[in-house]
């Protein structure tokens, strides 16, 4: 993947426009989770220290496009940056007709979604963004799968378009896991429905040496192996698809499961062999035998790609499968990449953050990359690198 990297450029005196992902939760005018801002700080600091004239922007929430709404303003982000950096940070509300900036100065450009034409990637708006800068830095992997004016169009018209450190690291890590993985390569796909992850499963079945399925997805594969899944969440119309995938790739099917009679936090977990599941049972997790078998597979893996928990880990009685998988990934000496909201929640819950080689910042973008789709922002950066 050939893109220009921001860190390879001389930015002294240059007007630098950074499209970051500062879409953080805000309550009562205060940022309540600063993970995305913290992730963007090294990029901003690098530009400031290089003596650039720095502009950074993002979307925040889902305002009506083209209309200012205070609840979606980036002002709380500006307040946060003022505390985090050794320079005064200002918010620019009207910036499309130009800005005056000094070297080493930082301005946050108000929410891009307040600008009409942002989501539709309109050329007129893209050119206005591009006219503000000498260098456009795309550093928001989380929105790289959307062709919008601030993520794609601006890069087509800016004098130089490059990948920021966050985006470059993301592409490198995902490329390492997907393009030429060290083998054996094990992929874990969890979630409730095969239908929502079908393209992910099909893509990974061609790359992985072992494809581990979990959650409601696993129930469809258990049914495909000829077992009763009782009242469990599964998709009868995709049983044949599951069989086809099992013919094409090594997909270990659970031998034992944790069941209950109702979807209830306090329901007792009954461990059963898959052949013993009753018509009124609901499968909510892997059993200890299955978890141990998967842990053994992960122990020997050289590359692990993880998307989705393998059970209802939010319930104490049904967390053992996901906990076991998490601990096996943490203990593995292989290269591991994890992504997706529920996966990140599991990583936090079981305290293995430091033991995962790379944690992806993108939800939808991560999935589209894993599906083998070309991300519009990445395609633009590749085109501009030629």
From Swiss-Prot:
<dbReference type="GO" id="GO:0004618">
    <property type="term" value="F:phosphoglycerate kinase activity"/>
</dbReference>
<comment type="subunit">
    <text>Monomer.</text>
</comment>
<feature type="binding site">
    <location>
        <position position="197"/>
    </location>
    <ligand>
        <name>ATP</name>
    </ligand>
</feature>
<feature type="binding site">
    <location>
        <position position="36"/>
    </location>
    <ligand>
        <name>substrate</name>
    </ligand>
</feature>
<dbReference type="GO" id="GO:0006096">
    <property type="term" value="P:glycolytic process"/>
</dbReference>
<keyword id="KW-0324">Glycolysis</keyword>
<keyword id="KW-0067">ATP-binding</keyword>
<dbReference type="GO" id="GO:0006094">
    <property type="term" value="P:gluconeogenesis"/>
</dbReference>
<feature type="binding site">
    <location>
        <position position="113"/>
    </location>
    <ligand>
        <name>substrate</name>
    </ligand>
</feature>
<feature type="binding site">
    <location>
        <begin position="59"/>
        <end position="62"/>
    </location>
    <ligand>
        <name>substrate</name>
    </ligand>
</feature>
<keyword id="KW-0547">Nucleotide-binding</keyword>
<keyword id="KW-0808">Transferase</keyword>
<dbReference type="InterPro" id="IPR001576">
    <property type="entry name" value="Phosphoglycerate_kinase"/>
</dbReference>
<comment type="pathway">
    <text>Carbohydrate degradation; glycolysis; pyruvate from D-glyceraldehyde 3-phosphate: step 2/5.</text>
</comment>
<dbReference type="InterPro" id="IPR015824">
    <property type="entry name" value="Phosphoglycerate_kinase_N"/>
</dbReference>
<dbReference type="InterPro" id="IPR015911">
    <property type="entry name" value="Phosphoglycerate_kinase_CS"/>
</dbReference>
<feature type="binding site">
    <location>
        <begin position="21"/>
        <end position="23"/>
    </location>
    <ligand>
        <name>substrate</name>
    </ligand>
</feature>
<dbReference type="GO" id="GO:0005829">
    <property type="term" value="C:cytosol"/>
</dbReference>
<protein>
    <recommendedName>
        <fullName>Phosphoglycerate kinase</fullName>
        <ecNumber>2.7.2.3</ecNumber>
    </recommendedName>
</protein>
<keyword id="KW-0418">Kinase</keyword>
<dbReference type="Pfam" id="PF00162">
    <property type="entry name" value="PGK"/>
</dbReference>
<dbReference type="GO" id="GO:0005524">
    <property type="term" value="F:ATP binding"/>
</dbReference>
<keyword id="KW-0963">Cytoplasm</keyword>
<feature type="binding site">
    <location>
        <begin position="340"/>
        <end position="343"/>
    </location>
    <ligand>
        <name>ATP</name>
    </ligand>
</feature>
<dbReference type="InterPro" id="IPR036043">
    <property type="entry name" value="Phosphoglycerate_kinase_sf"/>
</dbReference>
<feature type="binding site">
    <location>
        <position position="314"/>
    </location>
    <ligand>
        <name>ATP</name>
    </ligand>
</feature>
<dbReference type="GO" id="GO:0043531">
    <property type="term" value="F:ADP binding"/>
</dbReference>
<feature type="binding site">
    <location>
        <position position="146"/>
    </location>
    <ligand>
        <name>substrate</name>
    </ligand>
</feature>
<comment type="similarity">
    <text>Belongs to the phosphoglycerate kinase family.</text>
</comment>
